[in-house]
Amino acid sequence: SAASDTELNEKFVSGWLDKENNPVPDLFEFTKCVLRIPEAHEMIARYTVLDEDAKRLILLRPYQIHAIEAIREASKTGKSGYVWHTTGSGKTLTSYKATRNLLMDIPSIDKTIFLIDRKDLDTQTTMAFQAYANNDLVDVDETDNVNDLKKKLKSEDRQVIVTTIQKMQILISKRLKEDTPEYQKIKNLKIAFVVDECHRAVTPKTKRELERFFGRSLWYGFTGTPRFAENPYPQLGDLPRTTEKLYGERLHKYTIQNAIHDKAVLGFQVEHNGPKNVADETDSSVYNNETHMLRVLDIILNKSYHKLGFQNG
């Protein structure tokens, strides 16, 4: 049945966008993109999530769908890549669906692994990931320890595994003996890795080590802050220094500008309170002056108290 007025949150209603994040206002073009067969079936079967915690059915936004489709197309030809989606735009949901759909869509993939950094274990990312998985058709299992990870990798079950980069490193470097059946079995798995916060979760050195062990692996990174030539990884031998060199081509982009335009994230409130009657505003001594700094603190702590919501803690 249709949702009641109290259940449909208009804040989350959005128009359709094409792959380049351009609005599609034409009704017939929208119908062709979304409502014809098999697109309409896929929208329901592949791009909805039942959030166990919120007790809501979530329909993915267009940019999330385009990113997942781009990953699927890349995987068909054995290519890796990365997705640049701004912070706050729902990367966790997108990466969950990408991880899940890879396992369901590509029969040659034995397992998909959602890889996170240990310090992110108890964050909203993993809690949200598990909430999405509770009512899914695919088994999504977290790993309690390295032995548990090894057991899940040895299992014949095709499954989504959520684990940390640290456990994976320990497994391949210390817990597997070469030339044993379990070593060969795990080493020969066809695995698709989906990496959250890929700009920092897996270093170029660690990724190379994992790729050399899992020679048949695919890699898909999600980040809101990619590494470019302007902000590269530190130089370390011949290791890649940008996100594109590390993961492959960018598969989809949804920047902060796109998100603010679509009201997918909150915009910025900018106010200028600079020094007055100053001949040279580029003179750093003006801003290092104690009188000026105290005035700035007064504006932030006292005059912006309610505006910035400090009263709410």
Say what each PLM segment does:
Residues 279-313:
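Conserved helicase/translocase motor-coupling segment
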Residues 146-161, 185:
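Conserved motor-coupling elements within RecA-like helicase/translocase cores
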Residues 113-115, 220:
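Conserved hydrophobic packing residues within short motifs/helices of P-loop NTPase cores
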Residues 135-140, 263:
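Conserved AMP-binding/adenylation subdomain of ANL enzymes
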Residues 1-10, 14, 165-283, 293-294:
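Signature of the SF2 helicase/ATPase Hel1-core->accessory helical subdomain module
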Residues 89, 119, 140-150, 165-170:
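Conserved helicase motor
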Residues 1-113, 120, 124-135, 156-159, ...:
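ATP-dependent helicase/translocase motor core
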Residues 66-70, 94-101, 148, 164-167, ...:
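Well-ordered alpha-helical segments embedded in enzymatic catalytic cores
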